[in-house]
Amino acid sequence: MARILACGAFLKNAACLLDTHVPNAVQWSSQHGDLSDPRACIALEESVQQLLAQVGGPIDAIAHDLHPDFFSTHLALRLAYEHGVSAIAVQHHHAHIAAVLAEHSAHQGNPRPVIGIALDGVGLGTDGMAWGGEVLLVDGAHFERVGHLSPLTLPGGDVAAREPWRMAAAALHACGMAEQIVPRFAPTVGAQAARTIHTMLQRSLNCPQTTAAGRWFDAAAGLLGLSVRQEFEAQAAIALEQAAARYLQSHNLQVHDSDWAVTPNGQIDVRPLLLSTLITPDWHDPAAVDAAAARFHLTLADALSAHAIAQAHVHQVRDVALGGGCFFNRILTQRVVSQLEAAGLNVLQTKNLSCGDAGLALGQAWVALGIDSM
C-alpha cells in the first residue's frame, strides 16, 4: 500500500495522486497546459498542493519526468525534500506504456512483461537523445529498449518540430539526396533559408537527432507538400492522415516489406519507403500525394508491428501495449492493432485515459509505485 504523487509531462501537463489505500485510487488535477507557460507552472504547483492536502496520510514518493530541466522535475525534487521522501525519475515512454498498464487490472498488483509501442513527438531517452518511436520490453518498474525508429536530424533543434519542411530536408539528407534540398524548398521558403538548412545538415551544425515518430510524420508531410510551417501542434500529421484517409476510402493498398529494414540492434529503418514513395510524387497531383500518404501510414504501422511481434516471440510475451500521442491517428492505430491481433497477440490501449501526455502522470505514478515497493 502506498501513496504516490506524480507531476506529469511537460506538454499538456496534469498531475495525479495514486493512493492504493482507497478504492478510488487515482485523483487527477485539472489540465494545466504546457509548462513553457509560467501560468501553467503556477497552476501545477497549486494543484499539487491541493492533492497533497486531500490525501489521507503521508505520501511515499514523488514521480517526475527524466528531464532534469523541467519545472515539474524541480517541483518534484523540492517537494520530495520537504516531505522527506524519494523523488523518482521515470522515462517518458516507459510512463506512456505504464499508463496503459495501470488502466488494465490484469497488470496491477502482479504485473507481467509486455511489449510496448510508444509513439509521440518527443521525450528524453536514457541515452540523452530525443526519443519517440520506441519498442520497449516493459516489466513493471523496469524497461528495456528493444527497438526504435531510425533517427532523423532536427536542423535547428526544436524549431524543426514546427517547420515540417526542415524535417523533409533532413529526410532527403538521410537518404543521400541533400542536393535536392535547395531546388525543392527554395520556391516555398526562400533560397537563403533552404541553403542555410542544407549547410547545417552537411556540417552537422545545431542538428540534434531524434527517433520520434512525430517527426517522421512531419517529414512525410513536408516531402509531399502538405505542410511547410505548422500553425498548431500536429497540423502536419493531421493533414497527412486526412490525405491518407481520402485515398483509403476508395482504394486498397498493398504494402511491401522491402520498404523498411531492421538492423541487428533493432533500428527500424524506413528510408526505403522515402526513396520508393515519398520523394518522387508530383506535389501538384492530389491523387499521387494521397496515395503516398496512405502508403506511409500503412508501411510505418507494419514496420513497427512486425518488430513488436518479433520481440514478443523472442521474450515470450503475449501482450502489446500502445501509448503516446501518435495513437490519436486512427489509420495508424487500426493498422497496428489489426497486425498485432492477426499475429495472436493481445493489444492493450488506454480506455478512459488520454493516450497522449495528458495521461502520462498515471504511468509515472505506476512505475514509481513499483520502485517504491521493491
Q: How should each PLM-predicted stretch be described?
A:
Residues D65, H83-H96, D319-G323, R330, ...:
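Conserved phosphate-binding/catalytic loops in two-lobed NTP-binding clefts
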Residues Q180-R184, A365-M374:
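Acidic, glycine/GT-rich loop-and beta-edge segments that sit at the periphery of enzyme/chaperone cores
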Residues G56-D69, H315-C326:
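Short glycine-rich phosphate-binding loop at a beta-alpha junction
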Residues P113-H173, A194-Y247:
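Glycine-rich phosphate-binding loop of actin/hexokinase-like ATP-binding domains
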Residues P68-H83, V122, T126-V138, R330-S338:
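Short Gly/Thr/Asp-enriched flexible loops that form oxyanion-binding sites at enzyme active sites
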Residues M1-A2, A89-G116:
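Conserved phosphate-binding catalytic cores of ATP/NTP-utilizing and phosphoryl-transfer enzymes
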Residues L11-I42, E46, G176-M200, S204-V317, ...:
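A contiguous, well-structured pocket-lining segment that forms one wall/lid of small-molecule binding clefts
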Residues R3-A6, A63, V114-A118, T210, ...:
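Short glycine-aspartate micro-motif
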